[in-house]
Amino acid sequence: MQVNENPNKVPVELNRTSLYLGVLSVLVLGILFSSYFFN
């Protein structure tokens, strides 16, 4: 990992990945709960 070259770019990527993972997890949980309720 080359953190010394772009120290400001690493946390931004981590934040973006965390946001994408959070949105995906919420969507998956919503689909699962909706399927349980409909069934």
Swiss-Prot record:
The keyword Transmembrane applies. Keywords: Membrane, Photosynthesis, Photosystem II, Reaction center, Thylakoid, Transmembrane, Transmembrane helix. It is a single-pass membrane protein. It holds the Pfam family PsbL. InterPro entries: PSII_PsbL, PSII_PsbL_sf. The keyword Lipid metabolism does not apply. One of its GO terms (biological process) is photosynthesis. The chain crosses the membrane at residues 18-38. It is found in: Cellular thylakoid membrane. Signal peptide: none annotated. One of its GO terms (cellular component) is plasma membrane-derived thylakoid membrane. HAMAP family: PSII_PsbL. Belongs to the PsbL family. PSII is composed of 1 copy each of membrane proteins PsbA, PsbB, PsbC, PsbD, PsbE, PsbF, PsbH, PsbI, PsbJ, PsbK, PsbL, PsbM, PsbT, PsbX, PsbY, Psb30/Ycf12, peripheral proteins PsbO, CyanoQ (PsbQ), PsbU, PsbV and a large number of cofactors. It forms dimeric complexes. One of the components of the core complex of photosystem II (PSII). PSII is a light-driven water:plastoquinone oxidoreductase that uses light energy to abstract electrons from H(2)O, generating O(2) and a proton gradient subsequently used for ATP formation. It consists of a core antenna complex that captures photons, and an electron transfer chain that converts photonic excitation into a charge separation. This subunit is found at the monomer-monomer interface and is required for correct PSII assembly and/or dimerization. This is Photosystem II reaction center protein L. The gene is psbL.
